[in-house]
């Protein structure tokens, strides 16, 4: 299944064997009561109560006398510890232990079993206790009221230096939250006692709320109160120095007026109380380290024919409401859907019906979310019991007493990528898999292998393009928290294709009103995201439009011989050298193909320009990041782009078992060579539309394969349309490898006339042939006549200078001779100092004779 649950804790394996061993030791010493093992007969009494910030798990069970026993499982030492035994037959529904394990707070209610006498005072439904447990000593009653009370100790960040004051939250069913400040002191050695236990200072930090959630990892309290029928979400941050702040408030377009009272993550939502307080509404807040803030909401279902839920992407300034149709709805249904925090994604699922993965960081396009519905084995394998999403990726199954770490399964996502027929699922699975791997070479190799075999599998987007952009993005994503705003993570800008079975409505929402002036850590990142939503018009995403314009200018200047300062061009080419050096340092093994082994000045210019522009882009928007780090990020990003292209070519080269002799023009191309030519053509299409650089040598290899695999008319069409780019290296090899048969002469001539002038001048010297001389002559004449100004001249021709009685040719040669001898003459034809009017005359006669067959 796409969601992989890795068990970190299991009551049945990590606690129950220890309890049995303790019971066996007790009975062996004669302290036990003997008889049947109560734990075997009353296993339901053992359940998880709470998971604290440090990962320790508090559980409870009834001993053979009906007493309430509290235990703790240390996640670091993987050892169990008995905390406290309360000698009354009551039911525990909330418990918390401070970080030093010196104080225990618990709320108990009357047992629901028939025949049990009432252990509580008349008029009291809930008893809340504070117990000294190091060692067990005094017990203080904090509350004895006719409403439920939940308890939660605050955990400071610095656990190595215990604070003299402990803070305890009490959350009341009567819709208020209090914070108790508990001073402790050590007496008689290590004995810890509560100071002034008769009067514990307390603050009321929230009231009149209808919903609250505790974030144990970040020590945050989220709650919603109703103001004029509006649901206002607020957040309180607790700090290690014992202070707290109201961080923000934001209105939510949801109705909670008739939803009752709901708490999330204040201990385990044990099924007995879950049913009482949920009323089928699901609401939770998820955050991650990038500064995201999502509110997931599912109202009570009016009809089981379809499910509707909303996600408020508060850090993006909009909400999305998803409606999914259910198939094969039976009478037996789970009471609500489950939301799970998977860091970069939010999982939404209803066992047996659907499983959705929502992209938190890039929610704009629906195709970047994964929607699995209907009879899918990836859905059927999900747990059918309700799961409780704790902080981070921790997930608690209250029914079984198991604590999981929820992860996305790379293998399942790859399998989905390979097997699904829908473009939207391919897109989402590709992004999910790359997020899981984040640069893992094995994963990338598997994806490249699949793309090579299915390069035309998608009609809505270019697979190669999407893979290169997404994988390059993830290679540098972790370097800075703002990378998602600066680099594109996808090549797709719009998506208009409907997702089967999904209806989506997107709405703008109000941004939070921040209540503090200075921010650190997560809050700084969230505030940065909100500022980006307010002011980033247009978006900051890098694109190659400036590089495209500058590159075309440089190429144009090169053709006209008017290139700007040598220092500017040299700096650009130095950038390209740095990229290639960085790439080669990351890949020490030999390459199968002749990529990165030639100059290819045009690609190096493009590469260097991209380095320069991307570095400027980062420097503008990454304030406070060292320039050296930014330069390295730029080199890593562009190196990754080029490396992926090399990897795709080499994967196909290896797959088809090609060798170095393929690079010589000695035979027609094979099916294997054509397959590599085809994939290189697709790479070229993918990079051209995004104007991305190619590894030097790519065009040479592509052209060589094209010459060998394509008929002449197809080859020339590819050259004329820009699919094949003639390079000096490729043409020189062609001139040297091919003899002057009629077929090869036709090919050579067709190639030479299509060469850029600068390359053509060099190539013509390598071919001792009338055609070559003719081309050289044409170019020479063109240069001479460019600035020729007609002047009065003697109409008499000195015939003694010419050996041929052909007046047009004689007249033309005389003009060339005059130009060469006058001040109008241009610089000599580059590389051909012996090219003059006499050479032109001789070339013209040879070419004419060849055409006439003389």
UniProtKB/Swiss-Prot annotation:
Compartments reported by the entry: Golgi apparatus, trans-Golgi network
GO biological process terms, semicolon-separated: positive regulation of amyloid-beta formation; regulation of proteolysis
Tagged with keyword Metal-binding: no
InterPro entries assigned to the protein according to its UniProt record, in alphabetical order: GSAP_C_dom (IPR028010), GSAP_fam (IPR026172)
Keyword Iron listed: no
Tissue spec: Widely expressed.
Major location category of this protein: Golgi
Protein function: Regulator of gamma-secretase activity, which specifically activates the production of amyloid-beta protein (amyloid-beta protein 40 and amyloid-beta protein 42), without affecting the cleavage of other gamma-secretase targets such has Notch. The gamma-secretase complex is an endoprotease complex that catalyzes the intramembrane cleavage of integral membrane proteins such as Notch receptors and APP (amyloid-beta precursor protein).
GO cellular component: trans-Golgi network
Protein name (record): Gamma-secretase-activating protein
Molecular function as annotated in GO: amyloid-beta binding
């Amino acid at each position: 299944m796409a969601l992989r649950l890795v068990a970190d804790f299991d009551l049945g394996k990590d606690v129950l064997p220890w309890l049995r061993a303790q019971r066996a030791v007790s009975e062996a010493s004669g302290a036990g009561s003997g008889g049947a093992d109560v734990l075997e007969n009353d296993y339901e009494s053992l359940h998880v109560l709470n998971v604290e910030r440090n990962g320790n798990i508090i559980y409870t069970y009834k001993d053979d006398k009906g007493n309430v026993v509290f235990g703790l499982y240390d996640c670091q030492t993987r050892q169990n510890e008995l905390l406290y035994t309360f000698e009354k037959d009551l039911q525990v529904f909330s418990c918390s232990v401070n970080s030093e394990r010196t104080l225990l707070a618990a709320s108990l209610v009357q047992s629901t079993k028939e025949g049990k006498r009432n252990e509580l005072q008349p008029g009291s439904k809930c008893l809340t206790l504070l117990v000294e447990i190091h060692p067990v000593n005094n017990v203080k009653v904090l509350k004895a009221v006719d409403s439920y009370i939940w308890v939660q100790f605050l955990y400071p960040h610095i656990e190595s230096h215990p604070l003299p004051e402990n803070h305890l939250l009490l959350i009341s069913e009567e819709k208020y939250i209090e914070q108790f400040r508990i001073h402790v002191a050590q007496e008689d050695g290590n004995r810890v006692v509560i100071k002034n236990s008769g009067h514990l200072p307390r603050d009321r930090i929230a009231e009149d709320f209808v919903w609250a959630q505790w974030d144990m990892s970040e020590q945050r309290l989220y709650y919603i109160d109703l103001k004029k029928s509006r649901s206002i979400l607020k957040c309180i941050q607790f700090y290690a120095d014992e202070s707290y702040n109201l961080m923000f408030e934001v209105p939510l377009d949801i109705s909670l007026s008739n939803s009752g009272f709901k708490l999330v993550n204040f201990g385990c939502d044990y099924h007995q109380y879950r049913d009482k307080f949920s009323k089928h509404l699901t609401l939770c807040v998820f955050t991650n380290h990038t500064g995201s803030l999502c509110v997931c909401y599912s109202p009570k279902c009016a009809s089981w024919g379809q499910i509707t839920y909303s996600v408020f992407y508060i850090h993006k300034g909009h909400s999305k409401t998803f409606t999914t149709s259910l198939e094969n709805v039976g009478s037996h249904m789970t009471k609500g859907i489950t939301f799970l925090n998977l860091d970069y994604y939010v999982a939404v699922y209803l066992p047996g019906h659907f499983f959705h993965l929502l992209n938190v960081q890039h929610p704009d396009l629906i195709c970047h979310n994964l929607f699995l519905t209907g009879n899918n084995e990836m859905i059927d394998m999900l747990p059918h019991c309700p799961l409780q999403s704790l902080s981070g990726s921790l997930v608690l199954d209250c029914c079984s007493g198991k604590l999981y770490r929820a992860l996305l399964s790379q293998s399942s996502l790859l399998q989905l990528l390979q097997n699904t027929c829908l473009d939207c699922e391919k897109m989402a699975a590709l992004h999910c898999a790359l997020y899981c791997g984040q640069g893992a070479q094995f994963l990338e190799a598997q994806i490249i292998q699949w793309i090579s075999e299915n390069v035309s599998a998608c009609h809505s987007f270019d697979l190669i393009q999407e893979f290169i952009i997404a994988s390059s993005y993830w290679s540098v994503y972790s370097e800075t928290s703002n990378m998602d705003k600066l680099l594109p993570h996808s090549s797709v800008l719009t998506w208009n294709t409907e997702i089967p079975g999904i209806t989506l409505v997107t709405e703008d929402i109000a941004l939070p009103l921040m209540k503090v002036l200075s921010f650190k850590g997560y809050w700084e990142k969230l505030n940065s995201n909100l500022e980006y939503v307010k002011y980033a018009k247009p978006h900051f995403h890098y694109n190659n439009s400036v590089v495209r314009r500058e590159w075309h200018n440089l190429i144009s200047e090169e053709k006209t011989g008017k290139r700007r300062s040598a220092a500017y061009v040299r700096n650009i080419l130095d950038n390209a050298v740095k990229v290639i050096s960085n790439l080669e340092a990351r890949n020490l093994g030999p390459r199968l193909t002749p990529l990165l082994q030639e100059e290819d000045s045009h690609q190096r210019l493009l590469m260097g320009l991209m380095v320069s522009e991307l570095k400027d882009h980062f420097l503008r928007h990454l304030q406070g990041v060292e320039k050296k780090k930014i330069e390295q990020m730029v080199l890593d990003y562009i190196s990754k782009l080029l490396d992926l292209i090399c990897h795709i070519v080499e994967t196909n080269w290896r797959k088809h078992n090609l060798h170095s002799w393929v690079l010589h023009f000695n035979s027609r191309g094979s099916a294997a060579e054509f397959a590599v030519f085809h994939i290189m053509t697709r790479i070229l299409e993918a990079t051209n539309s995004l104007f991305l650089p190619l590894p030097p040598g790519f065009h040479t290899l592509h052209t060589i394969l094209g010459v060998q695999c394509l008929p002449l008319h197809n080859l020339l069409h590819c050259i004329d349309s820009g699919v094949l780019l003639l390079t000096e290296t490729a043409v020189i090899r062609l001139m040297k490898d091919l003899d002057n048969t009629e077929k090869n002469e036709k090919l050579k001539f067709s190639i030479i006339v299509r060469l850029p002038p600068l390359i053509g001048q060099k190539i013509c010297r390598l071919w001792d042939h009338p055609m070559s001389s003719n081309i050289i002559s044409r170019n020479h004449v063109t240069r001479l006549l460019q600035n020729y100004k007609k002047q009065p001249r003697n109409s008499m021709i000195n015939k003694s200078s010419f050996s041929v009685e052909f007046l047009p040719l004689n007249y033309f040669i005389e003009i060339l001779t005059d130009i060469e001898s006058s001040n109008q003459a241009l610089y000599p034809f580059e590389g051909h100092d012996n090219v003059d009017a006499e050479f032109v005359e001789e070339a013209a006669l040879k070419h004419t004779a060849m055409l006439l067959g003389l």
